[in-house]
Design a protein with these regions (language model features):
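Retroelement reverse transcriptase polymerase core
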Residues: 1-199
Length: 199
């Protein structure tokens, strides 16, 4: 509520239930009753998930394509420097048109609420988000940045050109109010992990 992402609303036509699922963390090793070491995934809390299956079934599907990962990785290969940027709370940066907000209504023990910003779980959210990011960076994609959802990989043939390209991408973020998660960003690195692949 305080962040302006949701607001209280009385019951509407579309009301979806909420489920809490474990938020997976890293891996640890735990001894079992036979004193054997067993790899175990740690739980770092719980994530609220809204079951939008009924709304999704009634929604017209958006087939905007996601970029081909292999083509992106090919364009990223063999550059001396990279800046790997991460969008902050990805989908929540996309506002929902006021006429459509009530469709995102969900109910939980604290009341009934609707989203002002695009939540996870909507069938068209990935396509909508990628379309928005592609629009924002359209003239820079494949020249100095690769964009996959909220992961932005800036590159250049030299340190100075990568730094210049980073400046252009950050300026575009500022112009469009796109917020980055600085804790997950890596600047001027010679290698890194992009979409699970080492570059």
């Amino acid at each position: 509520l305080d962040a302006g992402v949701i607001y209280p609303i009385s019951d509407r036509t579309w009301v979806s239930p909420v489920h809490c699922v474990p938020k997976k963390g890293g891996m640890t090793v735990v001894k079992n009753e036979k004193d054997e070491l067993i790899p175990t995934r740690t739980i770092t809390g719980h994530r609220m998930c809204i079951d939008y299956r009924k709304l999704n079934a009634a929604s017209r599907k958006d087939h905007f394509p996601l970029p081909f990962i292999d083509q992106m990785l090919e364009r990223l290969a063999n550059h001396p420097y990279y800046c790997l940027l991460d969008g902050y709370s990805g989908f929540f940066q996309i506002p929902i048109h006021p006429n459509d907000q009530e469709k995102t209504t969900f109910t939980c023990p604290y009341g009934t609420f609707a989203y002002k910003r695009m939540p996870f779980g909507l069938c068209n959210a990935p396509a909508t988000f990628q379309r928005c990011m592609t629009s924002i960076f359209s003239d820079l994609i494949e020249e100095m940045v690769e964009v996959f959802m909220d992961d932005f990989s800036v590159y250049g043939p030299s340190f100075s050109s990568c730094l210049l390209n980073l400046g252009r991408v950050l300026t575009r973020c500022e112009e469009t109010n796109l917020v980055l998660n600085w804790e997950k960003c890596h600047f001027m690195v010679k290698e890194g992990i992009v979409l699970g692949h080492k570059i």
